Amino acid sequence: MVNYPHKLSSQKRQPSLSQPKNFANRGMSFEKMINATNDYYLSQGLAVIHKKPTPIQIVRVDYPQRSRAKIVEAYFRQASTTDYSGVYNGYYIDFEAKETKQKRAIPMKNFHPHQIQHMEQVLAQQGICFVLLHFSSQQETYLLPAFDLIRFYHQDKGQKSMPLGYIREYGYEIKAGAFPQIPYLNVIKEHLLGGKTR
């Protein structure tokens, strides 16, 4: 058969012998799902939460063409704190998002001392601080309050992995939806604010 417009003959593809594909999120990364959720919250007037930019210092740029600049060398200016921050009903929100392919735990090496210190400072100012944890192999997402993350971090000095059992005991599972995709404000309202808002 000839395919228009390139007139290439089609060839039958051999089926792949690899593992079956998981189309649960249709290729959307966890970060993109959070960003889409935040866009939904903003469009509905529910919250203003944005991803924090990572400050970088550009060192070298190549210009292969006048209109196509390419950054070839850059460095982080400073250690970043958490991924997202904003406001929900007058409450300051600050959170980190982590995704793992592991089935039973999340490595604590994914959390850096400056992030833990930042979370402690947010909690000291009465902010709402937490981490969203996504286990991609099981398609499970949890909101773990920063207090419980910090407690575990200090127990093992950030060396081990946090077991899924601990996360299930102290965190709150978030079932993925359509709009919003990761409805974490529901957990904040029901569990962290006791069902009330200002």
Swiss-Prot record:
EC number of this enzyme: 3.1.21.10
Entries under CDD domains matching the protein: RecU-like (cd22354)
Subcellular location field: Cytoplasm
Site (Transition state stabilizer): 98
Catalytic activity as recorded in UniProt: Endonucleolytic cleavage at a junction such as a reciprocal single-stranded crossover between two homologous DNA duplexes (Holliday junction)
Function summary: Endonuclease that resolves Holliday junction intermediates in genetic recombination. Cleaves mobile four-strand junctions by introducing symmetrical nicks in paired strands. Promotes annealing of linear ssDNA with homologous dsDNA. Required for DNA repair, homologous recombination and chromosome segregation.
Protein name: Holliday junction resolvase RecU
Native organism: Streptococcus pneumoniae (strain CGSP14)
Record gene name: recU
